[in-house]
C-alpha cells in the first residue's frame, strides 16, 4: 500500500498580536494551524475578526507580539526576505498604479522581484492570458473595471512564481457576476499552477465554494477548523427556522430528534435529524408560527452554532473597534 504524505507548507504556532491603543486589544489570540501544499485554505469571519491581521503577519508586514510561523520552510521573524520571495499577495484594496498599463504594472513587479527580462516577458504573457487580460494589457489601469483590476492583480501576484498566494477579500465590493468570474479564475489557477492559496473572506458562499478547509475566526480566535462539508455535516441534521411570537421551547427541548435550539432576533433555529419527517410534529408542539423554513445547513449555521450569533449580524461594514466595544458590553 502506497501512502500519500501531504507536506505542510505553512505552519503557524501560537500566533498572537496585541495592539496598544488606549487599551490593549488582542487582534490575533494564540492561533495555531497548518496548511498543506496545494491546499486552498480559508480564514472566514466578520470584519474585525483578525483575518487580515493574521495574513499581514504571515506576509511579514506586521510583527506578531508572540508566537511564530514558517512559510515554505522559512521563519517569518528570522527569514522575512525569503518568506516574501515565496509568496504572492493580492491586497483587499487595489494597489496597481492607475497611470501605468496592465503590462507595465506587471513588468515593474517583475523588476522588483528580480525576474530576468526573458523570463519576465514570457511570464507576463502567461499570467495575463490565464486571467483573460492579454488583449487589454496596453490599456491604463484607470480604464479597467473593478473586476479587470482584480484580475490584473491576481496575475501580478503570480508573476514571480510564488509557492503560496495570499488573497485578502478577493471579491470585496464586486457585483455578483464579477465575483463569479473571479472565482472561476481562482479555480483555474489552482488547477493550472498548483499553487497553495490562503483566502480571507467574510462571504460564506465564497469560502464554501473555493476552500478545501476553513478556519472560522472570531475576535482573534479560531473557533473551529475543518472542511466546509464536515463543518455543516457535524451540525447533525437539517435546519428548521421559525419566526414565532411565543415559542414553547420547553416542549421542543424534550424532542429526541432535535439536536440544538437557538433563539435570535425573534426567530428560532432548530437543528433536526430527518427534519422533513418531523416538521409537522414540531409545528404542533411549538405553537403558532408566522413563517417556517426547512433547509440544509450553511456555514452561517456553523458560525451561529459556535459563536451564539448569526454571521450577518456583524455585516461587511462592522469595524474592529466597534466589534471590540460590542464584545466588552456583552461580557
Q: Which residue ranges define each predicted feature?
A:
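Walker A (P-loop) phosphate-binding loop of ABC-type ATPase nucleotide-binding domains
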Residues: 46-50
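Conserved ABC ATPase "signature" region
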Residues: 107, 111, 118-136
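Conserved catalytic motifs of ABC-family nucleotide-binding domains
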Residues: 161
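Catalytic Walker B motif of ABC-type/P-loop ATPase nucleotide-binding domains
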Residues: 165-168
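Helical segment within the ABC ATPase nucleotide-binding domain
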Residues: 180-193
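Short, charged/small-residue-rich alpha-helical element at the C-terminal edge
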Residues: 238-310
Amino acid at each position: 500500500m502506497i501512502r500519500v504524505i501531504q507536506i505542510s507548507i505553512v505552519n503557524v504556532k501560537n500566533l498572537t498580536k496585541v495592539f496598544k491603543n488606549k487599551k490593549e486589544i488582542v487582534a490575533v489570540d494564540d492561533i495555531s494551524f497548518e496548511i498543506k501544499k496545494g491546499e486552498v485554505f480559508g480564514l472566514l469571519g466578520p470584519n474585525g475578526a483578525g483575518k487580515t491581521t493574521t495574513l499581514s503577519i504571515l506576509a511579514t508586514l506586521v510583527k506578531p507580539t508572540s508566537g511564530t510561523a514558517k512559510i515554505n520552510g522559512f521563519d517569518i521573524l528570522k527569514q522575512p526576505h525569503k518568506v516574501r520571495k515565496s509568496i504572492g499577495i493580492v491586497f483587499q484594496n487595489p494597489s496597481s498604479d492607475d497611470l501605468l498599463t496592465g503590462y507595465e504594472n506587471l513588468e515593474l513587479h517583475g523588476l522588483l522581484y528580480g525576474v530576468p527580462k526573458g523570463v519576465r516577458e514570457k511570464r507576463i504573457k502567461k499570467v495575463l492570458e490565464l486571467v483573460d487580460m492579454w488583449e487589454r494589457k496596453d490599456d491604463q489601469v484607470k480604464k479597467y473595471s473593478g473586476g479587470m483590476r482584480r484580475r490584473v492583480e491576481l496575475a501580478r501576484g503570480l508573476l514571480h512564481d510564488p509557492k503560496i498566494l495570499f488573497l485578502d477579500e478577493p471579491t470585496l465590493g464586486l457585483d455578483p457576476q464579477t465575483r463569479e468570474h473571479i472565482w472561476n479564475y481562482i479555480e483555474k489557477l489552482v488547477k493550472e499552477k498548483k499553487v497553495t492559496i490562503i483566502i480571507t473572506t467574510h462571504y460564506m458562499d465564497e469560502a464554501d465554494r473555493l476552500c478545501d478547509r476553513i478556519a472560522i475566526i472570531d475576535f482573534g480566535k479560531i473557533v473551529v477548523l475543518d472542511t466546509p462539508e464536515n463543518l455543516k455535516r457535524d451540525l447533525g441534521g437539517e435546519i428548521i427556522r421559525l419566526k414565532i411570537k411565543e415559542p414553547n421551547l420547553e416542549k421542543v427541548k424534550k424532542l429526541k430528534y432535535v439536536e440544538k435550539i437557538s433563539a435570535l432576533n425573534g426567530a428560532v433555529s432548530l437543528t433536526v435529524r430527518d427534519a422533513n419527517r418531523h416538521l409537522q410534529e414540531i409545528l404542533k408542539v411549538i405553537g403558532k408560527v408566522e413563517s417556517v423554513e426547512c433547509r440544509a445547513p450553511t456555514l452561517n449555521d456553523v458560525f451561529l452554532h459556535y459563536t451564539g450569533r448569526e454571521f450577518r449580524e456583524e455585516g461587511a461594514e462592522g469595524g474592529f473597534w466597534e466589534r471590540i466595544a460590542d464584545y466588552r458590553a456583552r461580557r
